[in-house]
UniProtKB/Swiss-Prot annotation:
Any one Gene Ontology molecular-function term assigned to this protein's record: ornithine-acyl [acyl carrier protein] N-acyltransferase activity
Transmembrane segments: none
InterPro entries documented for this protein: Acyl_CoA_acyltransferase (IPR016181), Ornithine_N-alpha-AT (IPR052351)
Protein name per its UniProtKB record: L-ornithine N(alpha)-acyltransferase
Family: Belongs to the acetyltransferase family. OlsB subfamily.
Source organism: Pseudomonas aeruginosa (strain ATCC 15692 / DSM 22644 / CIP 104116 / JCM 14847 / LMG 12228 / 1C / PRS 101 / PAO1)
Pfam family, one: Acetyltransf_5
GO BP terms, alphabetized: lipid metabolic process
Amino acid sequence: MTQTAITREPVAGRRLKAERLNGARALREAQALRYRVFSAEFDAKLEGAEDGLDRDDYDRHCAHIGVRDLDSGALVATTRLLDHRAAERLGRFYSEEEFHLSGLDALHGPVLEIGRTCVAPEYRNGATIAVLWGELAEVLNEGGYRYLMGCASIPMRDGGMQAKAVMQRLRERYLCTDYLQAEPKNPLPPLDVPENLTAELPPLLKAYMRLGAKICGEPCWDPDFQVADVFILLKRDELCPRYARHFKAAV
């Protein structure tokens, strides 16, 4: 059963509520939000752009969750979830379009894939993502999923300098191929990066790492979104204790 999660941001005074996005109308809201975010920030080539939507064949196989502003009624954050059973019917996870995933079949326990996560620019703060994480926790708990996996993006507008610098940090602290190895089907081209070049982790990627997720290999170049996608894997029993409360999990 979905637990209503409402938070009031101390500065803006917004009231936010998590919800399951069931039905065609709610899905269209999610697709419209995705379009606004992805087209504006990545200049992405999106199916459904002529209708102001980001949609694809995976949408109908996924569960969709979101965060709504109770005062305006607007959907302000969303993500979609594809579980192992739906992936079996499809013949693949979405991530397998970009990566060869060695070890996926050997994972012990149910797997949930997260994707198309986006937050409206004016709502990018700890409160909004915490509400979204809380609803994700409900789905994880209900399904008994042991693994959460997906892709996190690094912008490539600078030709890949940020991606290379970010990957240097990720390799040093967050690389783990013990459970799964992700080989990109379209690797980034070689690029010399100065040793002193630093870069901030993109917010969503940082959020995953704080939860305890690991990267499982090198990034894949996504020309449609003009980003480098990094494959991440979060093992349920390795959640960072500091952030485990977002997932209502005992660790």
